[in-house]
Every structure is written in C-alpha cells, then in structure tokens.
Amino acid sequence: MSKEINPAVRLFGNRIYADQTSLEFLHEFLLIASAPKTWNEDGDTFESCLPRYTALDEGLNDGAQLKYAPRARLDLKLFSFLGASRLSSRDPAHHEHLNELREELGKKIMTEGDIAIGDVLDSLRDLFLGLQGAGNGRTWCAQTFLPLSRRCLAGETIWNQSKAHNNLTWYDSFISLSTYWSTNRHRFLARGGEVFYLQLCLALSRSKGDVNGLIHEAKLEFSAEEADPEQLHSKLEKGLSRLLDSSPHLDELAAFIENNDENESAYKTDLEHHFGSGRPHFVSTEAYPHACPKESWKIGYVFAVELSRILAMKLDPLERIAQLEMLFDLHILRHVTHLAAQRIKNEALPLPLANNWLGYSFVTSPENCTIPRLRKLSEISFRHTEQMLYDAVHSFVPEDEDERRQFYDSSTYRTQYYKEADKSHGFAVFRKIGKSMGFIVPRKGNGERLVLTENVLRTLVLALVPAGHDITYDQFKSEVYQHFGIVFDRDSIRLAMKETGNACDDPGYDIDVWVSTMLEQAAMLIPLSDSCSLVHNPVSLNMD
C-alpha cells in the first residue's frame, strides 16, 4: 500500500509514526525552526524560525511544500558517538577519519602543566556524548543530541553499511553520496516534527475572528496577546529564537569540532553542487493537505499558546527541553484522539463521544491506585480511546475506484489495507507515546489504564498557569479538561463516563485528593481553606 492511501495518514497527517520517539518529534520540529527555509526552491530563503506572518497564507495552499535545509553535522556526531556505538557499525573509514579529526583538533589546543591534549579531547568528547538524545544502540550517525542549541540539531543520516568496501575512505564515500549515506529515508525523524511545524503555520494563518470563535467554543482562557494570531506569532518567534540561542558556549565548542575539517564533510552533505556553486540541500515536507489535516488548526492553535508560554519561562536548559518534550507528548495524544473523534462525529459512527470541543476525555488515576473503582474507570477510559482510534481509522476506504472494488470483494485486501495503519500509526502511537511518558501503565501486560504522574502534572501547571501566578484549583481542573481532555475529580469523571456510554458508580467525593496532594508536595498548591486552594506556577518569566 502506498502512504497516500494509508488511512492513518489520511486522518492524522504524514506522518505520526509509532517508531519516532517523543524527543525525535521535538528534535525534528526544532530542526526545521533552525534551518534555512523556503516555500519555493527557486525563491528566497528565510532564516527566521517561522515564516513571516504576512507570508503564511501563500505557503498553505493545496500542493504547497515547505522546504528546509538541515545540517548533517557528521564530524560532530563522529567525534562524539563513534566510541559508544555498536562495534559492528564502526567502519574502518570512520575510525580513520576520527583519528585525523582528533589529530587536527589537537594542533589547535594549548595546555598547561601536565594536562595531556588527549585528555582534553576525551573530556570534550564526553561532554557531547553526555548530551546524547535519541538513538542509543543505533549507528553513530543515526543518533541525535539533546536539542539544546542550533548546533545540537542535525538531520537524519544513515550509513549504508552493506554498500561499503574495504578500500573505501571517508572522502571517497562522499563522491557517490547517495550510495553510502541516506539522508531522506525518514526512518527516525519520520516527519512527525514536520506535521506539527506545519500545523503551527496553519493555526497562525487563521483570522482573529476564527480564533475568537475557537476561544468561545472551547471555553479557553487566553490573554489578549494569545488571542491575536499576529501577536502570538511574534511571541513564538522570540521564544524559539531564544531557545536556539540559549547555549552559545556549547555552540562555540561544537563549531570548534566541526570547522576543524575546513567544513569538507559539511560541504559534501549540506550543499548541492550545480555549475561549480553550492546551495543548501533542501528537504521537502509533504504537500498540503496530506502533510497536515487542515481541520487540525484548532488544536494547533491551542498547542501554539501552550508552547509560547513554556518558551517564555525562565527554566534550566535541560528542564526546558524536558518540559517541551512532555508538552509534545500531550499534544501528540490530543492530536490523534481529537482527529479520531472528529472523524467519528462527521461519519456518524455509532460510538459515543465526550460532549466537549475535543470530543474525548481521559479518566486518570494515581500511579499506585488503591481505589478499585477509580482504577476500573481509568481502564474503561483507556479501552474507549482505543476503540475510538480503531473505529476512526477503519472508517476509511480506498479513494481509487479499482482499489475500492478490491476492498469490498476481498477480506485479505481489507486486512492488508489497515495493516500498516494498525501496526505503526493511530492507536500504536497513542500506546507508545503514552507508555513512554508514563501516562499509560503498566508498560507491559494487561489492564492498561491512564495515570497522572508528577512529571505530567508539572507540565500541565507550566502550560496552563501564568508564570509566577496562581489560579484556583477549580479553574485549574477546568483548564486541564478544556486543553487536554484530562479529568480526575468526581463530577467530571461521572460526566465523562456517562457521555461515553459507560455505567459509573459514584467514585466518591474525595476522589481527587491525590492530585492536590501531589501539587502540594511539589510546592504548586497554596491551601487557603478546606474548600478553596490556589494552584501556583513557581517559574518566573524570562526577561532577557
């Protein structure tokens, strides 16, 4: 089956893929933001994180493709990761080039006393190895760094080991680049970051009237700045630029390693050579509307607001990445579940939905749940979500008339049509991301249920409570529900179960005491009385 007729791609965009980790979703998103970009390969490129606000509409027509030019950063990856990669993946040509690289670097390092240059190089290697992000166990070039700065962002590169031969040198491998290196297979950076970058562009292109309609429909609490797409665009541009430029010393060290080879590796991998001149090697995103469903702009706008808030906060660099990764996790779950709910509603499928703008609700429980009724309700909520995603994907039939005829005539064809969607998209994504972030337990075995951990709760506070301010606990519960469909109190649980057609015994008045306890232990709850508490965001705004 081609990806164009994969029903999950038609529903969720190309592509939200289970084998892409949440850190790789974030990495790919920031990679696009940091790279030179263009809507037309023959036109002007732009270096800003986002397209100009006034140019968003031009690039969002059907068939439009955003093109971006990621750096491969092979020398930096080789220097950092080769020694920690699988022995079987270490090609002699790579070892030889690493030795050359270290030798040239050593000539530019001056030490005092009995400090050996080799020890300095080892310390520099260990620093960047400690910033390893995703891909542990892969070939060194297929691994990623934590996306802490511009030079920690690199495109996907895969070494075609089966094509290599004994006499191959590092530079020989670039003469026939596509033979020995693959830069466009999207195995790990599988386009999920592209989907959410394009979704952001789609959301910011909407009119102020559209956004006001969303705020009214979804009962959202946005500031005047957040309710204005142009002002939100400006805030996001500043926040993304600040993030990418927040570790200048790290970038200086990375530049020292990369530039030592006179950029020969980068010259071969990052540029296209036509008539003696080099221009950036562009990667094309998928075209609208296959790239990102246009009806997803509403959740895209809510995501843009949440993202802008966290980017504006004064956080330690590592915590900022952790919070952004968790926000991406929550948004991925929201993306697939909301679009599934919309499909079920539009096709009038016989599955009850939550009566909120998202169309779903997640009934959560504590990790170590001692309340059998609550544990059971959370399991039911998980299974209902599974059914939603399954039914939505399986409501699609082939668009091509001949294939549609085969679909109805052959059960084998029908099985094959949905096979990839069920295996690697849809609920496979929900399950994989949910378990990796701790939202679904247990990781293995039966009885899966939805839980609310301290890490998820902290991200919810940072995304929903203004920096350095407080909101009431009741308002916080409402915000969590309206943004993410997550419920944990008695009345909301009973309503959620009723709306989705599931019987529910009274779960008890103090069913959510565990949430307030977690907030209080994390210094994010201010008790005022038995009936009123404030949820506090302890992080201040970044005024730099």
Regions found by a protein language model. Give the residues of each.
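Extended, charge-rich low-complexity regions and/or helical-solenoid scaffolds
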Residues: A392-D544
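Generic structural signal of hydrophobic/aromatic residues within well-ordered alpha-helices
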Residues: L26-F29, F46, L56, L78, ...
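Alpha-helix boundary/N-cap detector
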Residues: Q20, D44, A69, R73, ...
